[in-house]
Amino acid sequence: MLVSDFHFDLPDELIARYPTEERTASRLLHLNGETGHFEDKQFFDLLDQINEGDLLIFNNTRVIPARLYGRKASGGKLEVLVERVLDEHRCLAHVRASKAPKEGAELVLGEDKLGEGNGFKAIMTARHDALFELHFNEEQPVFDLLQQAGHMPLPPYIDRPDEDADQERYQTVYSKVLGAVAAPTAGLHFDNPTLEKLKAKGVNIAFVTLHVGAGTFQPVRVDNILDHKMHAEYAEVSQAVVDQILATKATGKRVIAVGTTSVRSIESAAQAAEKEGKLIAPFFSDTSIFLYPGKTFRIVDALVTNFHLPESTLIMLVSAFAGYRNTMKAYQHAVEAKYRFFSYGDAMFINKNPNALNDLP
């Protein structure tokens, strides 16, 4: 199975650089995975697709202002993107500079926001492959420093500096647990009135946590997808969520994941539980689950998701869920119908294809 099987041509003007004025003002492409039929709708029509007793699962991770600009103490400019906070004073980060900092190098960060001479210092203490371990000398915890001086880590394809409005719009309204460096973007379409309408309809709601890492934007650098090494991200699925899933399955209702990160959290928990002979069990661990055509989904029955990059692991996940041909046809239609793509773009609602295992490239 080749990465090129998941290619499609995307005109640059279809990449959404800004969100819609209202969260729910996006368009929605409904794809029936079983029949391959798709239909153009508006996002608020999603309420008609979700039934009483269904369980909607969201990812409640909160994006940290993870991008810092600064300089080496020796003077060279650099950019830091925090990937993971290790403790109150240490983090793992990507560092972009003309020359990679060496162990022991001192970095001065945050002066663009705090003023020249008011930046804070970090020492590069170790390197772990592409990531640098940074130790912050300040008394304040890393999260506090990022809140003061960090920029929202907009994805590279948005191709503009972050603005004040992104502080709100690049977060879901229910985000709670700090730790992501990218938003779980399917959730950006939901506002509080929509959540209240879902609850009033008798739809059940649950939250998992997966801290989305910068690896989600990394291209697949191999020809055969079986050679791809998936990045790891930390995920949590609590006992309470497991109980909700089991109760939903017992009544014949659907488990609906909001976003690929929710899918990966839930299916990671199911995959780990299978070794114990269980359908699903609590999960608190890193996951590098890679779902591509030929892989099965043990729990998730339907999916709300945005439109993803060509040749990305996320379009592979959607193809595994809806069927390869169904997915590529729906994407071709989305391009022709001028849907808006990627993080600030439009959404899809997909019913699982029970025959997806037979629909391979």
Curated annotation (Swiss-Prot):
GO-annotated biological processes: queuosine biosynthetic process; tRNA wobble guanine modification
Enzyme class, broadest EC rank: transferase
Catalytic activity: 7-aminomethyl-7-carbaguanosine(34) in tRNA + S-adenosyl-L-methionine = epoxyqueuosine(34) in tRNA + adenine + L-methionine + 2 H(+)
Pathway assigned in UniProt: tRNA modification; tRNA-queuosine biosynthesis
Any single Pfam family the record assigns to this protein: Queuosine_synth
GO MF: S-adenosylmethionine:tRNA ribosyltransferase-isomerase activity
InterPro entries found in the cross-reference section: QueA, QueA_dom1, QueA_dom2, QueA_sf
GO cellular component assignments: cytoplasm
Keywords: Cytoplasm, Queuosine biosynthesis, S-adenosyl-L-methionine, Transferase
Protein EC: 2.4.99.17
Subcellular localization, as worded in the UniProt entry: Cytoplasm
Assembly: Monomer.
NCBIfam families (UniProt xref): PRK00147.1, queA
Family: Belongs to the QueA family.
Biological role stated in the UniProt entry: Transfers and isomerizes the ribose moiety from AdoMet to the 7-aminomethyl group of 7-deazaguanine (preQ1-tRNA) to give epoxyqueuosine (oQ-tRNA).
The name this protein goes by in its record: S-adenosylmethionine:tRNA ribosyltransferase-isomerase
Organism: Actinobacillus pleuropneumoniae serotype 7 (strain AP76)
